[in-house]
């Protein structure tokens, strides 16, 4: 506990959902996902996607894009402490709820990493690969769940990232 940075990356690995913080826990995000009203008409509304966005870079980039009157396909966005905190249960809840895709939008990782918690986006990418294998076994196209990277100052790219994801679905 003394070395905990409160990033939540342990959430994504915990199958029992017992790890929590006072103001952030697995069930809280799961409840947000389950309470979203998903449009019924795919043909009329287009693909229904959920965006789980890192609150450090991606979520502020989404907000800045909106403040600058950028436009993109409608969607629902939910902030997460770090993409490393994304639990497969959240993706499962979203797909069960009727979302056509889940976009994981976070900080850059790899050699040019910008993750505030260093490995969060990288950990999420590994978990996304496991989710893709599970979706494939269930007969669901694994590309319905994708992870994309954005820096806080790349808000002008956000509409293209979202529209590109929607087009792939």
Give residue spans per PLM region.
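Conserved acidic residues
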Residues: 49, 75, 100
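Cofactor-cradling patches in redox/metallo enzymes
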Residues: 78-156
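A short, flexible N-terminal coil/short beta segment enriched in small residues
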Residues: 24-56
